[in-house]
Amino acid sequence: MRIEAAELRILELPLKFRFETSFGVQTKRTILLLRLFGEGLEGLGEGVMERLPLYREETVAGARYLLEEVFLPRVLGRDLPNPEALREALAPFRGNPMAKAVLEMAFFDLWAKALGRPLWQVLGGVRQAVEVGVSLGIQPSVEDTLRVVERHLEEGYRRIKLKIKPGWDYEVLKAVREAFPEATLTADANSAYSLANLAQLKRLDELRLDYIEQPLAYDDLLDHAKLQRELSTPICLDESLTGAEKARKAIELGAGRVFNVKPARLGGHGESLRVHALAESAGIPLWMGGMLEAGVGRAHNLHLATLPGFTKPGDVSSASRYWEEDIVEEALEAKDGLMPVPEGVGIGVHLKLPFVERVTLWQRYMSAS
């Protein structure tokens, strides 16, 4: 597979609602969109890094520089027979998994199309629909939270995840648990706590949470292992997992009993497959996380979530929850708590180019010649 050309864009999409977490508020999403061209085909990748390094260290500006000045010049015009060859081409460059993932996932789409197969089959998936839940940002009040939770349960979502932080945790989770005693309920702290908050976190054991996600520092494993020994509630690791090596160490330390997989955070599908294999061998359940993706990233996530190790409902909920209009033609919508995987070869979605043009802030076309 020879990569003949690439088009890189920065898009800005307004969210339909204010999304608050422990580290800030989002009302719009900046998206890095990559189109790869080769052998008459097009592969699509989407970057989910943010303008500021609030989730992980990587940013839109940094990823744009690496793709435009380093990664794409290194692969344009090269014959890359498979994604492993692309991985080897990028291996000299340390870190930056989110920037690498944009290129790698676009290449996976291109490669699957060249094979004439849907991506989920190429990855080893076993289903054509994925169980999904919703991730709810911090609401203005407990009463508002209860109303939003009730609406999403009525829509059929199979898991409710609430964002929490010190001062917005036990009481809101207790209210939801009492109102919906049979709901699958989880909490996501986005690194808002430390071991000094042990007493607060132990109180959450009363609430029958399916797990508490990333309670401690974004790059930590050791303290999560200490905390897990104190809690009956499983800890789910998110930000701390940046690749298969970190996953291996997390398993050895006992730092978490559940893993959140985000291919964009891990460096793409290849590294996600390696994490999947480690987790399966250790008996650790996986679920597909979300980063407020538009249609390209959402489609990639759905294809990966068809692998057998993904046994818990993920965050890949309906696109219409987030956007008045998406960047792809296909409607990616859940029904009765299930998201169908897009049909067709590759990731199975096509850009809605007139809309993409309207929301483009910057673009550059690069060719091998």
UniProtKB/Swiss-Prot annotation:
Keywords: Isomerase, Lyase, Magnesium, Metal-binding. InterPro entries: Enolase-like_C_sf, Enolase-like_N, Enolase_C-like, Mandelate_racemase_C, Mandelate_racemase_N_dom, OSBS/NAAAR. GO terms for molecular function: isomerase activity; metal ion binding; O-succinylbenzoate synthase activity. The active site is at residues 163, 262. Binds 1 divalent metal cation per subunit. Acts as a N-succinylamino acid racemase (NSAR) that catalyzes the racemization of N-succinyl-L-phenylglycine. Also converts 2-succinyl-6-hydroxy-2,4-cyclohexadiene-1-carboxylate (SHCHC) to 2-succinylbenzoate (OSB). Catalyzes both N-succinylamino acid racemization and OSB synthesis at equivalent rates. However, NSAR activity is probably the protein's biological function, because menaquinone biosynthesis genes are missing in this species. Mg(2+) binds at residues 188, 213, 238. Belongs to the mandelate racemase/muconate lactonizing enzyme family. MenC type 2 subfamily. Homooctamer. Tetramer of dimers. It comes from the Bacteria. Its EC number is 5.1.1.-, 4.2.1.113. PANTHER family: O-SUCCINYLBENZOATE SYNTHASE, O-SUCCINYLBENZOATE SYNTHASE-RELATED. GO terms for biological process: menaquinone biosynthetic process. This is N-succinylamino acid racemase. Its cofactor is a divalent metal cation. It catalyses: (1R,6R)-6-hydroxy-2-succinyl-cyclohexa-2,4-diene-1-carboxylate = 2-succinylbenzoate + H2O. Pfam families: MR_MLE_C, MR_MLE_N. Coiled coil: none annotated.
